[in-house]
Curated annotation (Swiss-Prot):
GO-annotated cellular components: cytosol
HAMAP family, A to Z: NadA_type1 (MF_00567)
Enzyme class (EC, first level): transferase
Molecular function as annotated in GO: 4 iron, 4 sulfur cluster binding; metal ion binding; quinolinate synthetase A activity
Name used for this protein in its record: Quinolinate synthase
Source organism superkingdom: Bacteria
Natural source organism: Escherichia fergusonii (strain ATCC 35469 / DSM 13698 / CCUG 18766 / IAM 14443 / JCM 21226 / LMG 7866 / NBRC 102419 / NCTC 12128 / CDC 0568-73)
Location(s) in or outside the cell: Cytoplasm
EC number: 2.5.1.72
Homology family: Belongs to the quinolinate synthase family. Type 1 subfamily.
Reaction(s) the record says it catalyses: iminosuccinate + dihydroxyacetone phosphate = quinolinate + phosphate + 2 H2O + H(+)
Binding residues for iminosuccinate: H47, S68, Y139, A140, N141, S156, H226, P227, E228, T243
Protein backbone atom coordinates (compact mmCIF):
# COMPACT_ATOMS: atom_id res chain seq x y z
CA UNK A 1 0.00 0.00 0.00
CA UNK A 2 1.55 3.32 -1.02
CA UNK A 3 1.59 6.23 1.38
CA UNK A 4 0.77 9.47 -0.42
CA UNK A 5 2.79 12.57 0.37
CA UNK A 6 0.48 15.01 2.15
CA UNK A 7 1.08 18.54 0.82
CA UNK A 8 -1.37 19.93 3.37
CA UNK A 9 1.14 19.16 6.13
CA UNK A 10 3.98 20.89 4.29
CA UNK A 11 4.76 24.55 4.93
CA UNK A 12 6.67 25.99 2.01
CA UNK A 13 9.00 28.84 2.95
CA UNK A 14 8.17 31.88 0.88
CA UNK A 15 10.99 33.74 -0.87
CA UNK A 16 12.07 37.19 0.17
CA UNK A 17 10.15 39.88 -1.67
CA UNK A 18 12.27 41.83 -4.19
CA UNK A 19 13.40 45.26 -3.08
CA UNK A 20 11.09 47.87 -4.66
CA UNK A 21 12.70 49.96 -7.38
CA UNK A 22 12.37 53.69 -7.82
CA UNK A 23 10.85 55.13 -10.99
CA UNK A 24 14.32 56.02 -12.28
CA UNK A 25 15.65 52.54 -11.50
CA UNK A 26 12.75 50.92 -13.32
CA UNK A 27 13.37 53.09 -16.39
CA UNK A 28 17.08 52.21 -16.29
CA UNK A 29 16.49 48.47 -16.14
CA UNK A 30 13.77 48.55 -18.78
CA UNK A 31 16.09 50.17 -21.31
CA UNK A 32 18.93 47.87 -20.32
CA UNK A 33 16.77 44.79 -20.81
CA UNK A 34 15.60 45.97 -24.22
CA UNK A 35 19.22 46.43 -25.30
CA UNK A 36 20.35 43.08 -23.91
CA UNK A 37 17.49 41.19 -25.54
CA UNK A 38 18.62 42.47 -28.94
CA UNK A 39 22.28 41.74 -28.22
CA UNK A 40 21.53 38.20 -27.07
CA UNK A 41 19.02 37.39 -29.83
CA UNK A 42 16.62 36.70 -27.00
CA UNK A 43 12.88 36.95 -26.51
CA UNK A 44 10.84 37.20 -23.31
CA UNK A 45 8.15 34.65 -22.50
CA UNK A 46 6.08 35.80 -19.51
CA UNK A 47 3.21 34.18 -17.64
CA UNK A 48 -0.04 36.00 -16.89
CA UNK A 49 0.80 35.86 -13.17
CA UNK A 50 4.00 37.90 -13.37
CA UNK A 51 3.86 41.53 -12.29
CA UNK A 52 2.31 44.03 -14.74
CA UNK A 53 5.60 45.79 -15.49
CA UNK A 54 7.11 42.47 -16.59
CA UNK A 55 4.18 41.69 -18.88
CA UNK A 56 4.34 45.17 -20.35
CA UNK A 57 8.03 44.73 -21.13
CA UNK A 58 7.39 41.39 -22.82
CA UNK A 59 4.76 43.08 -25.00
CA UNK A 60 7.01 45.98 -25.93
CA UNK A 61 9.88 43.69 -26.96
CA UNK A 62 7.90 41.31 -29.15
CA UNK A 63 7.62 38.59 -26.56
CA UNK A 64 4.72 36.52 -25.31
CA UNK A 65 2.33 36.85 -22.37
CA UNK A 66 0.20 33.75 -21.97
CA UNK A 67 -0.73 30.66 -20.04
CA UNK A 68 1.72 27.78 -19.76
CA UNK A 69 0.42 25.97 -22.86
CA UNK A 70 0.87 28.97 -25.15
CA UNK A 71 4.24 29.75 -23.52
CA UNK A 72 5.36 26.27 -24.57
CA UNK A 73 4.11 26.73 -28.12
CA UNK A 74 5.56 30.22 -28.53
CA UNK A 75 9.00 29.36 -27.21
CA UNK A 76 9.34 26.29 -29.40
CA UNK A 77 8.38 28.15 -32.58
CA UNK A 78 10.16 31.48 -32.07
CA UNK A 79 13.43 31.88 -34.00
CA UNK A 80 15.33 33.50 -31.11
CA UNK A 81 18.32 31.50 -29.89
CA UNK A 82 17.68 32.47 -26.26
CA UNK A 83 14.41 32.40 -24.32
CA UNK A 84 14.06 34.51 -21.18
CA UNK A 85 11.29 32.76 -19.24
CA UNK A 86 9.60 35.00 -16.68
CA UNK A 87 7.66 32.54 -14.58
CA UNK A 88 8.44 29.65 -12.25
CA UNK A 89 10.98 26.87 -12.59
CA UNK A 90 8.81 24.20 -14.22
CA UNK A 91 8.09 26.66 -17.05
CA UNK A 92 11.79 27.06 -17.73
CA UNK A 93 12.24 23.29 -17.66
CA UNK A 94 9.36 22.83 -20.09
CA UNK A 95 10.92 25.36 -22.45
CA UNK A 96 14.22 23.45 -22.34
CA UNK A 97 12.50 20.11 -22.92
CA UNK A 98 10.79 21.46 -26.04
CA UNK A 99 13.73 23.58 -27.27
CA UNK A 100 16.97 21.81 -26.27
CA UNK A 101 18.99 23.72 -28.85
CA UNK A 102 18.11 27.05 -27.25
CA UNK A 103 19.57 28.78 -24.23
CA UNK A 104 16.84 29.03 -21.59
CA UNK A 105 17.36 31.75 -19.00
CA UNK A 106 15.28 32.59 -15.94
CA UNK A 107 15.56 35.64 -13.68
CA UNK A 108 15.98 33.17 -10.81
CA UNK A 109 16.22 29.40 -10.66
CA UNK A 110 14.68 29.50 -7.18
CA UNK A 111 11.19 30.44 -8.41
CA UNK A 112 9.22 27.42 -7.22
CA UNK A 113 5.58 26.33 -7.37
CA UNK A 114 3.67 24.79 -4.48
CA UNK A 115 2.14 22.22 -6.84
CA UNK A 116 5.60 21.19 -8.02
CA UNK A 117 6.97 21.13 -4.46
CA UNK A 118 3.93 19.15 -3.35
CA UNK A 119 4.66 16.28 -5.74
CA UNK A 120 8.07 14.80 -4.80
CA UNK A 121 9.13 12.30 -7.44
CA UNK A 122 10.02 9.41 -5.09
CA UNK A 123 6.62 9.44 -3.41
CA UNK A 124 4.87 9.98 -6.72
CA UNK A 125 6.68 7.06 -8.34
CA UNK A 126 5.65 4.82 -5.43
CA UNK A 127 2.06 6.00 -5.81
CA UNK A 128 2.05 5.24 -9.53
CA UNK A 129 3.69 1.85 -8.95
CA UNK A 130 0.85 0.96 -6.58
CA UNK A 131 -1.70 1.60 -9.37
CA UNK A 132 -0.10 0.18 -12.53
CA UNK A 133 -3.44 -0.16 -14.32
CA UNK A 134 -3.98 3.61 -14.44
CA UNK A 135 -2.91 6.14 -17.07
CA UNK A 136 -0.76 8.83 -15.46
CA UNK A 137 -1.78 12.40 -16.30
CA UNK A 138 0.19 15.22 -14.72
CA UNK A 139 -0.48 18.92 -14.76
CA UNK A 140 2.11 21.16 -16.41
CA UNK A 141 2.90 22.53 -12.93
CA UNK A 142 5.32 19.69 -12.20
CA UNK A 143 9.05 19.04 -12.40
CA UNK A 144 10.73 17.47 -15.40
CA UNK A 145 11.27 14.23 -13.45
CA UNK A 146 7.56 13.95 -12.66
CA UNK A 147 6.65 14.69 -16.28
CA UNK A 148 9.02 11.91 -17.33
CA UNK A 149 6.97 9.43 -15.31
CA UNK A 150 3.70 10.51 -16.93
CA UNK A 151 1.81 9.21 -19.92
CA UNK A 152 0.31 12.66 -20.54
CA UNK A 153 1.03 16.24 -19.53
CA UNK A 154 -1.90 18.64 -19.52
CA UNK A 155 -2.69 22.28 -18.82
CA UNK A 156 -5.91 23.58 -17.32
CA UNK A 157 -7.00 24.94 -20.70
CA UNK A 158 -7.42 21.44 -22.18
CA UNK A 159 -7.76 19.28 -19.05
CA UNK A 160 -11.47 18.54 -19.40
CA UNK A 161 -11.18 17.67 -23.09
CA UNK A 162 -8.19 15.37 -22.57
CA UNK A 163 -9.68 13.47 -19.64
CA UNK A 164 -12.98 13.15 -21.50
CA UNK A 165 -11.03 11.64 -24.40
CA UNK A 166 -9.17 9.17 -22.18
CA UNK A 167 -12.39 8.25 -20.40
CA UNK A 168 -14.03 7.49 -23.75
CA UNK A 169 -11.23 4.97 -24.32
CA UNK A 170 -12.06 3.28 -21.02
CA UNK A 171 -8.89 4.40 -19.27
CA UNK A 172 -8.66 4.92 -15.52
CA UNK A 173 -6.60 7.93 -14.48
CA UNK A 174 -4.01 8.98 -11.94
CA UNK A 175 -4.19 12.77 -11.77
CA UNK A 176 -1.47 14.92 -10.23
CA UNK A 177 -0.76 17.14 -8.51
CA UNK A 178 -3.69 19.59 -8.04
CA UNK A 179 -6.57 17.96 -6.17
CA UNK A 180 -9.02 20.79 -6.82
CA UNK A 181 -8.47 20.76 -10.57
CA UNK A 182 -8.58 16.97 -10.54
CA UNK A 183 -11.94 16.96 -8.76
CA UNK A 184 -13.28 19.62 -11.12
CA UNK A 185 -12.26 17.56 -14.15
CA UNK A 186 -13.74 14.41 -12.60
CA UNK A 187 -17.04 16.20 -12.00
CA UNK A 188 -17.11 17.51 -15.57
CA UNK A 189 -16.28 14.19 -17.23
CA UNK A 190 -17.37 11.45 -14.84
CA UNK A 191 -14.01 9.76 -15.39
CA UNK A 192 -12.45 7.31 -12.92
CA UNK A 193 -9.76 9.56 -11.42
CA UNK A 194 -7.44 8.92 -8.49
CA UNK A 195 -6.14 12.32 -7.37
CA UNK A 196 -2.83 13.32 -5.85
CA UNK A 197 -3.46 15.81 -3.05
CA UNK A 198 -1.52 18.93 -4.06
CA UNK A 199 -2.83 22.49 -4.02
CA UNK A 200 -1.84 25.90 -5.34
CA UNK A 201 -1.07 28.20 -2.41
CA UNK A 202 -2.80 31.09 -4.20
CA UNK A 203 -6.06 29.46 -5.28
CA UNK A 204 -6.44 27.35 -2.16
CA UNK A 205 -6.80 30.54 -0.10
CA UNK A 206 -10.05 31.68 -1.69
CA UNK A 207 -12.85 31.11 0.83
CA UNK A 208 -16.61 31.06 0.32
CA UNK A 209 -17.57 33.21 3.31
CA UNK A 210 -15.51 36.20 2.19
CA UNK A 211 -16.54 35.74 -1.45
CA UNK A 212 -20.21 35.59 -0.45
CA UNK A 213 -19.85 38.90 1.38
CA UNK A 214 -18.28 40.50 -1.67
CA UNK A 215 -20.99 39.05 -3.90
CA UNK A 216 -23.67 40.61 -1.70
CA UNK A 217 -21.84 43.93 -1.89
CA UNK A 218 -21.78 43.72 -5.72
CA UNK A 219 -24.82 41.62 -6.71
CA UNK A 220 -24.50 42.67 -10.35
CA UNK A 221 -21.00 41.19 -10.67
CA UNK A 222 -20.08 37.95 -12.41
CA UNK A 223 -17.66 35.61 -10.64
CA UNK A 224 -14.76 34.17 -12.65
CA UNK A 225 -12.89 31.25 -11.07
CA UNK A 226 -9.79 29.23 -11.92
CA UNK A 227 -10.42 25.49 -11.36
CA UNK A 228 -7.39 25.21 -9.07
CA UNK A 229 -9.73 26.80 -6.49
CA UNK A 230 -11.68 24.73 -3.94
CA UNK A 231 -14.93 23.16 -5.15
CA UNK A 232 -17.07 25.50 -3.02
CA UNK A 233 -15.55 28.50 -4.85
CA UNK A 234 -15.99 26.84 -8.25
CA UNK A 235 -19.65 26.23 -7.41
CA UNK A 236 -20.17 29.99 -7.02
CA UNK A 237 -18.73 30.81 -10.45
CA UNK A 238 -20.41 32.23 -13.53
CA UNK A 239 -17.36 31.15 -15.54
CA UNK A 240 -14.64 28.57 -14.76
CA UNK A 241 -11.47 28.19 -16.78
CA UNK A 242 -7.76 28.58 -17.30
CA UNK A 243 -6.17 32.01 -17.38
CA UNK A 244 -6.72 32.42 -21.11
CA UNK A 245 -10.26 31.09 -20.81
CA UNK A 246 -11.06 33.53 -18.00
CA UNK A 247 -9.86 36.43 -20.14
CA UNK A 248 -12.09 35.20 -22.96
CA UNK A 249 -15.01 34.90 -20.54
CA UNK A 250 -14.46 38.45 -19.34
CA UNK A 251 -15.03 39.61 -22.92
CA UNK A 252 -18.13 37.52 -23.58
CA UNK A 253 -19.98 37.94 -20.29
CA UNK A 254 -22.44 40.86 -20.36
CA UNK A 255 -21.62 41.93 -16.80
CA UNK A 256 -19.82 45.25 -16.35
CA UNK A 257 -18.30 44.20 -13.03
CA UNK A 258 -16.24 41.02 -12.59
CA UNK A 259 -14.99 39.33 -9.42
CA UNK A 260 -11.90 37.33 -10.35
CA UNK A 261 -10.70 34.36 -8.30
CA UNK A 262 -7.19 33.74 -9.52
CA UNK A 263 -3.77 35.36 -9.18
CA UNK A 264 -4.12 39.12 -9.54
CA UNK A 265 -1.34 39.17 -12.12
CA UNK A 266 -4.03 38.30 -14.67
CA UNK A 267 -5.58 41.74 -14.26
CA UNK A 268 -3.02 43.33 -16.61
CA UNK A 269 -4.17 41.42 -19.70
CA UNK A 270 -7.77 41.08 -18.58
CA UNK A 271 -8.15 44.83 -18.18
CA UNK A 272 -6.70 45.30 -21.67
CA UNK A 273 -9.34 42.89 -22.97
CA UNK A 274 -12.21 44.66 -21.17
CA UNK A 275 -11.08 48.26 -20.58
CA UNK A 276 -14.59 49.45 -19.74
CA UNK A 277 -15.29 46.80 -17.11
CA UNK A 278 -14.49 46.92 -13.40
CA UNK A 279 -12.33 44.08 -12.09
CA UNK A 280 -12.44 43.09 -8.43
CA UNK A 281 -10.10 40.70 -6.64
CA UNK A 282 -11.83 37.77 -4.99
CA UNK A 283 -10.87 37.87 -1.30
CA UNK A 284 -8.47 35.35 0.18
CA UNK A 285 -8.60 33.86 3.67
CA UNK A 286 -8.74 36.57 6.29
CA UNK A 287 -9.27 39.19 3.58
CA UNK A 288 -5.62 40.24 3.76
CA UNK A 289 -5.20 39.76 7.51
CA UNK A 290 -4.12 36.14 7.60
CA UNK A 291 -3.55 35.16 3.97
CA UNK A 292 -0.11 33.89 2.97
CA UNK A 293 -0.13 34.51 -0.78
CA UNK A 294 -2.86 37.19 -0.75
CA UNK A 295 -3.81 36.37 -4.36
CA UNK A 296 -0.31 36.70 -5.81
CA UNK A 297 2.24 33.91 -6.17
CA UNK A 298 5.37 34.86 -4.19
CA UNK A 299 7.60 32.97 -6.61
CA UNK A 300 6.13 34.74 -9.64
CA UNK A 301 6.93 38.00 -7.85
CA UNK A 302 10.63 37.07 -7.96
CA UNK A 303 10.65 37.93 -11.67
CA UNK A 304 11.69 41.56 -11.25
CA UNK A 305 13.30 43.96 -13.70
CA UNK A 306 16.68 43.89 -11.96
CA UNK A 307 16.72 40.09 -11.91
CA UNK A 308 15.87 39.92 -15.62
CA UNK A 309 18.66 42.34 -16.49
CA UNK A 310 21.14 40.32 -14.43
CA UNK A 311 20.05 37.06 -16.08
CA UNK A 312 20.75 38.52 -19.52
CA UNK A 313 24.04 40.13 -18.55
CA UNK A 314 25.82 37.95 -16.00
CA UNK A 315 27.30 34.45 -15.88
CA UNK A 316 24.82 32.09 -17.53
CA UNK A 317 25.47 29.27 -15.06
CA UNK A 318 23.53 31.16 -12.41
CA UNK A 319 20.46 31.65 -14.60
CA UNK A 320 20.47 28.96 -17.30
CA UNK A 321 18.04 26.04 -17.15
CA UNK A 322 19.54 22.60 -17.75
CA UNK A 323 17.71 19.30 -18.12
CA UNK A 324 19.54 15.97 -18.39
CA UNK A 325 19.20 14.73 -21.97
CA UNK A 326 17.86 11.27 -21.11
CA UNK A 327 15.35 12.85 -18.76
CA UNK A 328 14.44 15.43 -21.39
CA UNK A 329 13.72 12.75 -23.97
CA UNK A 330 11.41 10.90 -21.57
CA UNK A 331 9.56 14.07 -20.53
CA UNK A 332 9.22 15.15 -24.16
CA UNK A 333 6.96 12.19 -24.99
CA UNK A 334 3.97 13.21 -22.80
CA UNK A 335 4.54 16.89 -23.59
CA UNK A 336 4.35 16.21 -27.32
CA UNK A 337 1.21 14.18 -26.76
CA UNK A 338 -0.31 17.21 -25.07
CA UNK A 339 0.69 19.56 -27.89
CA UNK A 340 -0.58 17.16 -30.55
CA UNK A 341 -3.88 16.75 -28.73
CA UNK A 342 -4.21 20.52 -28.29
CA UNK A 343 -3.61 20.96 -32.02
CA UNK A 344 -6.54 18.66 -32.81
CA UNK A 345 -8.78 20.80 -30.62
CA UNK A 346 -7.72 23.93 -32.46
CA UNK A 347 -8.59 22.30 -35.75
Amino acid sequence: MSVMFDPDTAIYPFPTKPTPLSIDEKAYYREKIKRLLKERNAVMVAHYYTDPEIQQLAEETGGCISDSLEMARFGAKHPASTLLVAGVRFMGETAKILSPEKTILMPTLQAECSLDLGCPVDQFNAFCDAHPDRTVVVYANTSAVVKARADWVVTSSIAVELIDHLDSLGEKIIWAPDKHLGRYVQKQTGADILCWQGTCIVHDEFKTQALTRLQKQYPDAAILVHPESPQAIVDMADAVGSTSQLIAAAKTLPHQRLIVATDRGIFYKMQQAVPDKELLEAPTAGEGATCRSCAHCPWMAMNGLQAIAEALEQEESNYEVHVDERLRERALVPLNRMLDFAATLRG
